[in-house]
């Protein structure tokens, strides 16, 4: 049995700042239109980004639509402070970032036309997962669109195999740096050991080990060595979401 107790703080190791085109409100609005909805106009849209990190995913939209208003929330005070400095330096006036637990999100923050929750759902407890769906139910405006991503089963089982190997190999080490270095050694061992093997399983392990070796250290720490990373079957997520009055855009 693997002891999954790696608590790697996002304050200690900030997540790398990425932008994700599939969470961009114009893209989400287009999807809604294709499904026969009448999503709110982008020019004056109110955006909520749950687990925003340093908030870079909000900046392009805010610059393009200066009359819009965006709020990004994240538990990591370090990431929020980094993001606030970026926003201040760029002189962007219509984005707010706040260090806040998802559990503390409520109606006092207002309602939103587009809510994005990318890279959060699989990495939090069941309590927080339920709260995310509650937030969408209470804070999403009529005809608004929400985006949630998560690691989907059964496909995630393949990556989780390597994740568990990395966690087992590194669990006796105390610091994030040591865990990461040991995991890199494991990946090299996997790659070297399977160099001449041509079985489908060996091919997968070898190629996945090579791929993980190219990722940023901070990404590997949170994705493969973090305390929680739980895959979800699509039907399980749909069953939970259907308990709320959502129309699912599949």
From Swiss-Prot:
UniProt xrefs under Pfam families: Methyltransf_31
Cited Gene3D superfamilies: Vaccinia Virus protein VP39 (3.40.50.150)
Protein name: Uncharacterized protein RP028
The organism of origin for this protein: Rickettsia prowazekii (strain Madrid E)
């Amino acid at each position: 049995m693997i002891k999954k107790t790696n608590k790697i703080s996002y304050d200690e190791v900030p997540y790398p700042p990425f932008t994700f085109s599939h969470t961009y409100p114009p893209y989400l609005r287009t999807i809604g239109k294709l499904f026969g909805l009448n999503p709110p106009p982008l020019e004056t849209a109110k955006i909520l980004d749950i687990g925003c990190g340093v908030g870079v995913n909000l900046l392009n939209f805010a610059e393009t639509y200066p009359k819009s208003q965006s709020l990004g929330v994240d538990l990591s005070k370090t990431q929020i402070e980094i993001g606030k400095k970026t926003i201040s330096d760029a002189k962007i006036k219509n984005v707010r970032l706040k260090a806040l637990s998802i559990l503390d999100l409520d109606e006092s923050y207002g309602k939103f036309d587009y809510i994005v929750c990318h890279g959060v759902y699989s990495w939090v407890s069941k309590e927080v997962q339920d709260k995310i769906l509650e937030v969408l139910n209470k804070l999403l405006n009529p005809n608004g669109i929400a985006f949630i991503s998560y690691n989907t089963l059964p496909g995630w089982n393949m990556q989780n195999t390597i994740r568990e190997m990395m966690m087992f190999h590194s669990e006796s080490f105390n610091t994030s740096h040591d865990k990461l270095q040991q995991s890199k050694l494991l990946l090299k061992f996997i790659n070297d050991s399977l160099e001449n093997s041509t079985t489908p399983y060996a091919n997968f392990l070898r190629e996945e080990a090579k791929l993980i070796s190219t990722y940023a250290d901070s990404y590997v720490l949170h994705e493969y060595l973090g305390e929680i990373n739980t895959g979800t079957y699509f039907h399980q997520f749909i069953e939970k979401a259907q308990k709320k009055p959502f129309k699912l855009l599949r």
